[in-house]
């Protein structure tokens, strides 16, 4: 899989736009907005669905394991801003796994750790353009 796309449930429309742009450019993506979850996890895979859940619940464990497996198998990582704590934790995991990391969307404030991103793109089209240029440079 090419990309793991992370973001906030509150920003899921923007996440879907990034997934659409990447898939339109021929990439394969994993994202919570399109993931197929099993029955245990499905109840939690909705806006606010996991907010009051206990971490030990089987559905929460299933969600975590599926998302982590997808993150490990992805070649690159995209964070769609603004995003919450969970998506930022996923960013740290991706960086720790030595994935190329990109951000898309408005950065509400300057964060020094955002330097881990190879690029901070303004919108999905900007991300696709940046990736095309970066990929062309790697081929040379």
Indicate residue ranges for each PLM-predicted region.
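Conserved catalytic or regulatory cores that recognize and/or transform ribose-phosphate-containing ligands
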Residues: 1-140
């Amino acid at each position: 899989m090419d990309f793991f796309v992370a973001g906030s449930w509150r920003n899921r429309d923007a996440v879907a736009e990034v997934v659409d742009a990447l898939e339109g450019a021929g990439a394969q993506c994993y994202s919570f907005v399109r993931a197929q979850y099993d029955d245990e996890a499905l109840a939690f895979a909705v806006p606010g669905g996991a907010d009051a859940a206990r971490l030990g619940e089987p559905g929460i464990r299933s969600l975590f394991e599926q998302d982590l497996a997808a993150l490990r198998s992805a070649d690159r990582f995209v964070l769609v801003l603004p995003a919450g704590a969970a998506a930022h934790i996923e960013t740290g995991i991706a960086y720790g796994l030595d994935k190329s990391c990109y951000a898309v969307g408005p950065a509400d404030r300057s964060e020094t750790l955002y330097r881990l991103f190879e690029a901070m793109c303004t919108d999905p089209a900007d991300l696709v353009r940046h990736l095309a240029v970066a990929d062309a440079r790697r081929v040379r």
